[in-house]
From Swiss-Prot:
Zn(2+) binds at residues 129, 133, 203. HAMAP family: Pept_M48_protease_HtpX. It comes from the Bacteria. Its cofactor is Zn(2+). The active site is at 130. This is Protease HtpX. The keyword Nucleotidyltransferase does not apply. It holds the Pfam family Peptidase_M48. Its EC number is 3.4.24.-.
Amino acid sequence: MINNLKTFILLASLTALLVVIGGLLGGSTGMLVALLFAGIMNFSAYWYSDTLVLKMYNAEPLSNNHFVYHIVSELAHRAGTSVPKVYLINNSTPNAFATGRNPENASIAVTTGLLDRLTQEEITGVLAHELAHVIHRDTLINVVSATIAGTISGIANMFMWLSMFGHSSNNEEGVHPVVGMIMMIVAPLAAGLIQMAISRSREFEADAGGARISGNPQWLASALLKLDQANHEQYFDEAETHPATAHLFIINPLNGEKLANLFSTHPSTAERVARLRAMY
């Protein structure tokens, strides 16, 4: 409940930041343009982001006879939700993610490395975690937050280019060039931090929800420890090529030697494991 409230506050803050930036740059018209732009991007992301991300990772659909599909199907029926489509990514780095605009149009993807490295119980824990993301509609929340953050960065970049070519605003509703330059630097950073905080909050909720669906928090805790270790041992090439998708995965797939928690899309594995173990 606390994490859900936190997510709402963070999304509201992200939207407010977008409106403020639009207002500073273009007054009331700027506010409307910023919201309209974000709305168009969110509409596109809502309908097409799942297809796009699956293509990015060359994910192939698994047959209904595959044991992973059977696990997902059993977990979905246990949770009383639709059975997502299941995909396999041919990559030796163990990881997984969920995508889709709602439970009826959701997909779960796992890597070959995850199936090779984890036990069936640990795989079940991971799949339950991803199913919890689907049930909580975290895939939609993440798309919205990423889109708004991206819009803020885009507006900041646009202001930078306009300033470079001498097109800064001089009207009453315009913003002073110095203030604009400061905002250009600070706003994308603030938006990114808020987006990352939303992602971290949703991971905790999915951990708890997944543990309840599988019936054993230890399965996910054990899987997270193995996945975290693997993340230190090898690179996930496709994820490094598409860093904007890092927040989708159960473990941060990027190998940048552990930035401070403030700048991470995921909570620390140690804290996640501790919370899971405290459930029993």
